[in-house]
């Protein structure tokens, strides 16, 4: 028998199956809602349960379950539906009690198959302190990427709002991106609460997915604000560029190259401060002038040396800063073209052209950052210090900026932590399937060598 928990005054098995009748969205279709313990609810029409029974599990259950409920003459619909409900509940209970090693059963119910003892791994005391997907309510889709989606979630006990990034292990393996995901995890763990880098609260996994629980930033992407306003003032652009430079300088101190700076990876918080997110393309262990040669990044912001497949160093991030600063002021990246090959040719060969509508310090900064020869690029000698000391940033009080004591030039309209008005409708309209996102954990965490040591808990923010 499974473990017990209290529901009101009744003692309930943790893996007890309940089935209820509900009406579908069309108010006509009868739907059977199955729930295991206090887990997420799975809603399907009767025919789906019957098909699953006939095609996948018929041989796993006693003969009494092979007799399907049939409507008798003069029998009321209510009685007929109730018979179906009881049949579904009893069959599902039998399968959950006896067949959780079956892949078909686990897939249908979105539960974890128990592993043999020699396949389990003790992840230490922090494993118990960390969260699982079942500790959260999934509220809204707020982002989408190559390997998964980002959700606004609410912790059931504390009611705190977070962003949860959920990635598919299968997709990550197919694209050979395991190293990048683990690098992202390592960078997030070592952020040490930098004011302009998103913080990780928890990371955990199950058989199919990886989960990052992060700060929820609902002031909107810099990209969205830039699209709406076309361009920013020089003063506002300076504020954002200073924050970005601080974040990049901090990563460089930790021997990390970011490699994917772009407006889509910069989020505003409710106070109007920028926060750098998405560390999937970070390169670790880049001490001093050490170089690497992996071709990666976003086309519009690639430095010439990356396009030419030459060795590159930390100065690629300063090229990206120049590109983003240019875009904030003029509305498009500096060498933009819809044709990538044409754009690459411009990045490599075309001289930088700047309008005379900006100040001399701004012109000099962008020119220095977008120097095609990385050995002459601003930041090559003293990294962040070169950027910080540039005349363009003379109005910036760096200590007050890092302490978040400066008033932001723009404060987004945010009502509360759950406000999603600054999130793209493209994401918000994506339907959520809680049962697949938070499968019932019927066993200890299984060993996964590809993602070993992925699990993390910020001990200063333990939830449970």
Swiss-Prot record:
Subcellular location: Cytoplasm; Nucleus; Apical cell membrane
Gene Ontology MF annotations: ATP binding; metal ion binding; phosphatidylinositol binding; protein serine kinase activity; protein serine/threonine kinase activity
GO cellular component: apical plasma membrane; cytoplasm; nucleus
Presence of keyword Nucleotide-binding: yes
Residue stretches spanning the membrane: none
EC number: 2.7.11.1
SMART domains: S_TK_X, S_TKc
Activity regulation annotation text: Phosphorylated and activated by pdk-1.
Annotated residues for binding of ATP: 142-150, 165
Record keyword Amino-acid biosynthesis present: no
Major location (coarse): cytoplasm
Gene3D superfamilies assigned: Phosphorylase Kinase, domain 1, Transferase(Phosphotransferase) domain 1
Family: Belongs to the protein kinase superfamily. AGC Ser/Thr protein kinase family.
Known role: Acts downstream of PI3 kinase age-1 and kinase pdk-1 in the daf-2/insulin receptor-like transduction pathway. Essential role in regulating development, stress response, and longevity. Phosphorylates Forkhead-related daf-16 and the longevity-promoting skn-1 transcription factors, which inhibits their entry into the nucleus and antagonizes their function. Plays a role in the intracellular trafficking of proteins such as mig-14 to the cell membrane, and this may be through positively regulating ceramide synthesis. Acts downstream of rict-1 to regulate fat storage, size, and development.
Assembly mode: Interacts with pdk-1, akt-1, akt-2 and daf-16. Part of a complex containing sgk-1, akt-1 and akt-2. Interacts with let-92 phosphatase regulatory subunit pptr-1.
Name of the protein: Serine/threonine-protein kinase sgk-1
């Amino acid at each position: 028998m499974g473990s017990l928990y209290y529901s009101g005054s009744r003692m309930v098995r943790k893996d007890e199956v309940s089935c209820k009748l509900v009406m579908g969205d069309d108010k006509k279709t009868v739907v059977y809602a199955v729930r295991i313990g206090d887990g997420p609810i799975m809603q399907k029409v009767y025919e789906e349960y019957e098909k699953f029974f006939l095609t996948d599990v018929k041989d796993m259950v006693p003969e009494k379950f092979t007799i399907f409920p049939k409507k008798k003459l003069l029998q009321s619909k209510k009685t007929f539906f109730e018979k179906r409900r009881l049949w579904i509940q009893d069959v599902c209970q039998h399968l959950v009690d006896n067949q959780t090693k079956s892949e078909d059963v686990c897939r249908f119910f979105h539960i974890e198959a128990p592993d043999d003892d020699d396949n389990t791994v003790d992840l230490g005391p922090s494993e118990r302190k960390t969260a699982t997907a079942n500790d959260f309510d999934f509220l809204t889709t707020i982002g989408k990427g190559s390997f998964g989606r980002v959700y606004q979630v609410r912790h059931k006990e504390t009611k705190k709002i977070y962003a949860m990034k959920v990635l598919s292990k299968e997709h990550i393996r197919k694209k050979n991106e395991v190293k990048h995901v683990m690098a992202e995890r390592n960078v997030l763990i070592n952020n040490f609460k930098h004011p302009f880098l998103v913080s990780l609260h928890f990371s955990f996994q199950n058989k199919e997915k990886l989960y990052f629980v992060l700060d929820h930033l609902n002031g909107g992407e810099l990209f969205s604000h830039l699209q709406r306003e076309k361009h920013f003032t020089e003063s506002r652009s300076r504020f954002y560029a200073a924050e970005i430079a601080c974040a990049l300088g901090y990563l460089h101190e930790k021997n990390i190259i970011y490699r994917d700076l772009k407006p889509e990876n910069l989020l505003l918080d409710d106070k109007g401060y920028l926060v750098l997110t998405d560390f999937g393309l970070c390169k670790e262990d880049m001490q001093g002038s050490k170089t690497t040669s992996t071709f990666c990044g976003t086309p519009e912001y690639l430095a010439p040396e990356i396009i030419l497949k030459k060795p590159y160093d930390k100065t690629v991030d300063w090229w990206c800063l120049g590109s983003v600063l240019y875009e904030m002021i003029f509305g498009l990246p500096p060498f933009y073209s819809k044709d990538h090959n044409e754009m690459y040719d411009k990045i490599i060969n075309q001289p930088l052209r700047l309008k005379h509508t900006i100040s001399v310090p701004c012109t000099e900064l962008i020119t220095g950052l977008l120097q095609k020869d990385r050995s002459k690029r601003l930041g090559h000698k003293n990294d962040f210090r070169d950027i910080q000391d540039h005349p363009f940033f003379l109005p910036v009080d760096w200590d007050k900026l890092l302490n978040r004591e400066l008033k932001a030039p723009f404060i987004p309209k945010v009502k509360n932590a759950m406000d999603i008005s600054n999130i793209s409708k493209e994401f918000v309209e994506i339907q959520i399937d809680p049962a697949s996102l938070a499968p019932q954990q019927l066993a200890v965490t299984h060993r996964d060598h590809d993602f070993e040591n992925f699990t993390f808990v910020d001990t200063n923010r333990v939830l449970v």
